[in-house]
Regions:
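Transmembrane alpha-helices and adjacent helix-loop boundaries
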Residues: 1-295
Length: 295
């Protein structure tokens, strides 16, 4: 029915009860915030002296900017590698060749089950023992390896689910046109699957950015680690963490906004140009009028 709803509209008593619950929740929230503010103010964490260091260029140059640079570098490289690895593994799991499908399935399930931190630590010590990278890049390589392997496995499942969600008629039509499985996957299925699953991919890319902070365990210079060092150096842990939180929220919001814009652009490009409007049909009377009104 056009006017149906999923639940009954609340009556007068239900509206009053909902209003009371909302008011009590708001009051309790304000009280909790006031208690937190009072405790921080009593400890002197909200004084102007605690925030003044963030107005100096030396603090940003020494602590914050190197952390931002490390976080963005690790996230950018990991995102590119994870997308490539995830797409390859996702397509492999859909392969008609059984050994390829089994190997890709084992790889995906294995790296999905491992914690990111364990993979970072393992890669860090492996690279250190084998002298794979210079010592100054060991932590970065370990972070990128852990983020790439874990998120690549997750993205593989996203790609596989996106392809499986498409109508079977897509593949059948491609087969009728004589396209091979690889051509069908590359030209028809993957573009549609990635576009339809783009919101989920965006969420996973934000996870990549946030998980880069785990790298502080292997001495990776990232923004959260640098924030704690600011707190230790200036004795302003709370202001430092607040600033770092604002920076991370801003970067994540920018990434989400960019991905949303890209999604809209991709959807608009798939629609193609607007259809041309047909001219008004010429009637027999029009010909007659043009020839003096008679035929």
């Amino acid at each position: 029915m056009a006017g149906s709803v999923l639940f009954d509209a609340p009556g007068p008593r239900a509206r009053i009860r909902n209003w009371v619950i909302s008011a009590v929740t708001a009051v309790v929230t304000l009280l909790v915030l006031w208690v937190v503010y009072s405790r921080l103010d009593a400890k002197g964490q909200l004084t102007a002296a605690k925030w003044e260091p963030f107005l100096t260029a030396n603090l940003w140059k020494t602590y914050i900017w190197p952390g931002i640079e490390g976080t963005l570098t690790a996230a950018a490289v990991s995102i590119v590698l994870a997308l490539a690895l995830g797409t390859a593994l996702g397509v492999g799991r859909l392969s008609h060749i059984a050994p390829v499908r089994w190997v890709c399935s084992v790889i995906v399930e294995f790296f999905r089950a491992l914690p990111v931190l364990i993979m970072m630590i393992f890669a860090y010590f492996l690279y250190a023992q084998q002298d794979v990278f210079p010592s100054k890049h060991l932590a970065l390589a370990g972070v990128i390896t852990g983020l790439t392997l874990y998120n690549g496995a997750v993205i593989a499942e996203i790609v596989r689910a996106g392809v499986n969600a498409l109508p079977r008629g897509q593949s059948e039509a491609a087969s009728a046109l004589g396209l091979t499985w690889g051509q069908t996957m590359r030209a028809i299925l993957l573009p549609q699957a990635i576009t339809s699953m783009l919101p989920v991919l965006i969420s996973q890319l934000v996870v990549v950015l946030k998980d880069s902070s785990i790298g502080f365990v292997i001495t990776f210079v990232e923004v959260v680690r640098q924030g704690t060092q600011v707190g230790a150096a200036y004795g302003n842990y709370v202001p430092a963490l607040i600033v770092i939180a604002i920076l991370m929220i801003s970067v994540n919001f920018a990434l989400s906004h960019l991905a949303t814009w890209l999604e809209g652009r991709m959807r608009r490009s798939r629609r193609g140009p607007a259809p041309m409007h047909a001219d008004e049909p010429v009637t027999q009377g029009a010909f007659g009028a043009g020839a003096g009104g008679t035929i």
